[in-house]
Amino acid sequence: MYVPTQEGEFSVDEMRNVVLGKQIAKNEFKPWWACAAGFAVGAGSVLYIGAYENRPILSLAVPIVYATGFSFVRPTKKGIIKRHPEYQDNEYFVYGYQNKGRRKIMLNTIIGTLGGMVVGSVTSLALKSTGNITYIVRP
């Protein structure tokens, strides 16, 4: 039950629209691209910077900076209106959708980045243990 207690808080109808936006984003917004891009950055930085250039600290810093930057990304208002034209003039629905969407993007980015770093590290260790490292691009 929601009851606004201070001036400047959402009214009951406004909060209903915010919650509706969050619920719809939770059920239908699937930012798979954030996970895939995070995986590519995580694995690529560990393999290339960590193994090829032999800079392990930098290879860990790149995915962390990438994931931090992606924590500010959110679904666009234009994209939300395209999927839900009936809420075109409802800024509270858009706010709720963007709020939940931002969290899902951040979580998927972190999961993908950590997964990529693990896969990149295991692959790098496997390549180093065999001693036969063949790089596609030579300096």
Locations of regions flagged by a protein language model:
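Periplasmic N-terminal soluble interaction domains immediately after the signal peptide in Gram-negative
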Residues: 1-3
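Hydrophobic alpha-helical membrane segments
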Residues: 5-139
